[in-house]
Each structure stands twice: as C-alpha cells, then as structure tokens.
Amino acid sequence: MAQEDVFKKLVAHCKEYGYVFQSSEIYDGLSAVYDYGQYGVELKNNIKKYWWDSMILLHENVVGIDSAIFMHPTIWKASGHVDAFNDPLIDNKDSKKRYRADVLIEEQLAKIEDKIIKEVEKAHKRFGEAFDEAQFRATNARVLENQQKWDDLHSRFARALNDSNLEELRQIIIDQEIVCPVSGTRNWTEVRQFNLMFSTDMGSTADGAMKIFLRPETAQGIFVNYLNVQKSGRMKIPFGIAQIGKAFRNEIVARQFIFRMREFEQMEMQFFVEPGTELEWFRTWREARMKWHQALGFGSENYRFHEHEKLAHYANAAVDVEYRFPFGFKEVEGIHSRTDFDLSQHEQYSGKKLRYFDPEKNESYVPYVVETSIGVDRMFLQVIAASYHEEEVTGANGEKDIRTVLRIPPALAPVKLAVLPLVKKDGQPEKAREIIDSLKFDFNCQYDEKDSIGKRYRRQDAIGTPFCITIDHQTEQDNTVTIRTRDTMEQERIPVEKIREIVAEKVSMKNLFRKLN
C-alpha cells in the first residue's frame, strides 16, 4: 500500500474511532485546527504523563511550572521573536497558493532520497541475504548519481539558509524545476519573510489597549520565572524546569493533519547549567531523549538524529529527533544548547539581574541552558502512525478477514480493559458491571454488550484496547473469565480476583520507565 494511502487511512481511522475531529466541523471546519475526541484526549493525557513523570519523577533536579499564555510583550522583543520569528514564503502566481520555500526544497531532497532508497530496496529483494548495502551504495551508478544530486542540493540549500539568502532560495526552486502541487506551473513570486506570531489587544478600549501576543513557545515562561523557581526551591545548578502548555503560530502552510497546526501543545524542559558544561549536557540529553522515544518499542530503525544545518540565533548546538512517518522522516523533538542568550536578553530588557550565585565557586554567573522541546500533537501522530496495522486473519468460519488494530503501548492506551458479557442474559451483564465497578479506580475500563463477541473484539482492537475480559457461562461456575490479548489475539482463563493484578502490571507506566534507567 502506498504511504500516501496509509496516511489517509490513519486520518479516517482517527475520526471514525473518536481520536481526532476537524474543529468546528458543522461550520465546514477551520483550517489546521483540530479537536481531540474521547479516546484522543485519553491518549494525549497518557503521552503527557509519560513525559512529565519521566522528567519530574525520574530526575530529582527537574521541577515543573505552569506559566501564563499571555505575557508582557517586551518578552517577545527580548527573545528575538518580534524581529526574527519568520518563515520564508513563496507564492505561485497561477494557483495563488502560498508555500514555505524551505519546505519545497526539503521535499525535493526527500524525493531524491526516495529514489536512492527504492534502488536499495530493489537490490535487497534481488540478492536477499547476500546483499551488501554499503557496497551497493558505493558502486551502483544510479545510486551514485542521485547521491551526488542530493549532496549538491543539500550543500547549496544549507548555505542559503545559513546566509538567510532569500534570492538563492528562490533560485534553487527555479533550478530544481519545482512545480506548484496545485497548478503544476513554475510561475513563482519572490521569497519574503513572514512573522508567525498571533497578536491581540489587552484592555477595554482600542486607544488604551496594549498589543500582546499569543505565545509561540512555552520556553520564555520558564526563563522569566527561572530565578523564582531557583530561590523558592533552593535549587542548585544543574537543574531543570519542565512545562506542558499550549502555543500558537500563524502557520501559512499548515498541513499533514495534526503534524503542523496553528494551535498546538508543547512539552519543554529547560536545563540550567554552568557555562562551559553546556555541550556535555547537550550530549547527555540528546541520548536520553532518543532513549525515551525508543522505549515505546516502535523500532530503533524508525528514528534518527538530524543535525541542524543552520543554528537558531540563540543556539550553539542543535539536533532533532526524527521519526519515519508515512510521509517521511520528520521532526518530533528538538534538543538545543541555547547558551545564555535568553537570560542575558531578559536581563538587558527588564533591567533585573538574572544571575545565579554558585556557593561552591563563590561567584555569580548567567547560566547556560540546554532545552528539550517536543510537540504533544506530533508525538500523538507518531504513536498512532506506529501503532496502526492492518492484517489478514482467518475467522472461526474459515473465511479471511482484515483486522485493523492499534498496537498502542499498553501504558499509553486510552482504554486499558474492555469487559464483555458473552450474552445479555443469565446474569452475565450484572457480573460484568460488578467487575468494572471493582476496577474503575485502577485503570480506564469500558463495558460493551452490543453485537457479537467477534465484532466487539474487532472494535476494541481498532480503539487500541490491550486487553478484553469475557464473562461467559463458565464464569458462574468457577468465577473465572477469559482474558484476550490484543496483539496476539491469544486467550486464557484467569480467576476474577487476578484481573486487577494481571492487567495493572501489564499497563503500568513503570514498564516504560524501567527502560530509561
């Protein structure tokens, strides 16, 4: 199945099973704005809990904060967002559609890379176990030709970004003969910068109102509170401050479902360190964050690091954790060494000292900062994309069928356990309700009695429920039930009194945390 078709199925599945809805749908929707449904909000909360607890519970020197969305407008001048938070945009004169110039070029690079990958995959199928990929890449003429094209374009693109050369970005688009996806033409305007911040007025009258911004990131709320947290918590460097919260960006090119939205949620941690140690801590958090992603069990081959070609104005090192989505490798998390840029800027613009006094060295300094920043919505999409499977199964009648299943890690699954009476009589519904009542304070359970047991299993598979308990006629005799495992479809009988112990152990977040130590 083509990857584009897989992605369309993911989007349709999310709507059909209550994960994600188009916002304001009865009014024909609002572009790049989405709502999370009954299962989506549970998965989202579980992802946030996994991140929050892995930061706060597993690190004694990391604490949390919840800062306001509205902040003093000078904060955004100090941070550089007013002057430098821009995207390079280009319009197609025929379709009147607007695109990010850098994204058009990145997609061209991805197309060249796809050609290389297809050549390698074809050769691998042809030669089987004897295939030497390294040798093939080094000797195959088509691979070498495309690799040279990729290297040349990548180098030219990196220079243009580093120099903020908008004319060169346009020239690359022209030279690569990149066409508008809508019109199919190459009739492009000049490239220009566009600021991404939303603004509004705070105050009762237009004349007396103050222009403020909806925060484009959560990090600045941490920086302006860092000294409050340090002093009130008696924190010693190195220490971190973590936050989960909404951010807003006026993305002109917002697409790929919830991957890029105008209203989104971030999970960020700013780690304050002694100047001179920031790159060591950068490497430490770089490896720790990749480990966090891989602990979910989606395959290490589906992750990679992407070093930044152009560093942001505040950074001296930066790397992205990328995941292989159906539409290619894309960023899910960024790790940045932000130096002392933010705190020094806020010192300058506020006139307040933001220095840390080091009692061991008997000196004061502005700490350097290492940041980890992950998008909740992108992480959500990663989990759904990695978990979605279609497989052929043989039914009890011997007929072939397609089973759609979300193999969400049990600790993140919205519903942990479905309790299903085999029939709606003989006291089975009452027994099922009794079991749910005894478990509902331990984990999220769902009762379902509609349709055949086979259809109910399929429905829970599509939701991503890791375990189903079935109450049948034998339950009345020996107080046992059937427990079915989602991923294997295997079933076994267990005593009712063992349900809590068995399920709780398998859905515990501790199973993920153990992989991080």
Where are the regions that the model predicts?
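NTP/phosphate- and nucleic-acid-binding module
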Residues: M1-N517
